[in-house]
Regions:
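Short, hydrophobic/aliphatic alpha-helical segments
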Residues: 1-11, 37-41
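Conserved phosphate/anionic-ligand binding catalytic regions in large, soluble enzymes, centered on
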Residues: 8-26
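A generic structural motif
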Residues: 13, 47, 105-107
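Electropositive phosphate-/nucleotide-binding environments in soluble metabolic enzymes
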Residues: 19-23, 54, 81
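Generic alpha-helical propensity signal that fires on short helical segments
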Residues: 28-30, 57-61, 114-117
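A structural-propensity feature for long, helix-poor, extended segments
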Residues: 38-74, 82
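C-terminal regulatory domains involved in ligand/effector binding and gene-expression control
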Residues: 63, 69-117
Length: 117
């Protein structure tokens, strides 16, 4: 059973899956790839279609730095969930990694890579 702290969270924006989840994912990416200095983020499905209104792009820019991130809106859903994101992580011009993550509600995340869970 979930604790009350898991059930009731205060976040930015009107939708936890569109702000808390992407914010948490961006923090995890930043923490995991400390040498990165540029990011491309692809918001898929529902995140792409309603992300601007729900401030998804703004919360990611806030975490990764507006000058360091390019955000792309892709209407097609990824296979596992309507709220999919792909983070491409760079150091200078070298691609360090590409991470697929899903914001599944309430700030919870599902990564394609089990090492990031």
């Amino acid at each position: 059973m979930e604790s009350l702290r898991e059930l009731y969270k205060i976040g930015v924006g009107p939708s936890s899956s569109h702000t808390m989840g992407p914010q948490k994912a961006a923090f995890k990416i930043k923490e995991t790839y400390q040498d990165a200095n540029h990011y491309e983020v692809y918001l898929h499905g529902s995140l792409a279609l309603t992300g601007k209104g729900h401030l998804t792009d703004k919360i990611i820019e806030e975490v990764l730095g507006k000058e360091n991130v390019e955000i792309h809106f892709v209407s097609e859903e990824l296979p596992k969930h309507p709220n999919g994101m792909i983070f491409k992580v760079y150091q200078d011009d070298k691609l360090l990694d590409s991470i697929t993550v899903y914001s599944i509600g309430g700030g919870a995340l599902l990564y394609d890579d089990d090492n990031l869970q």
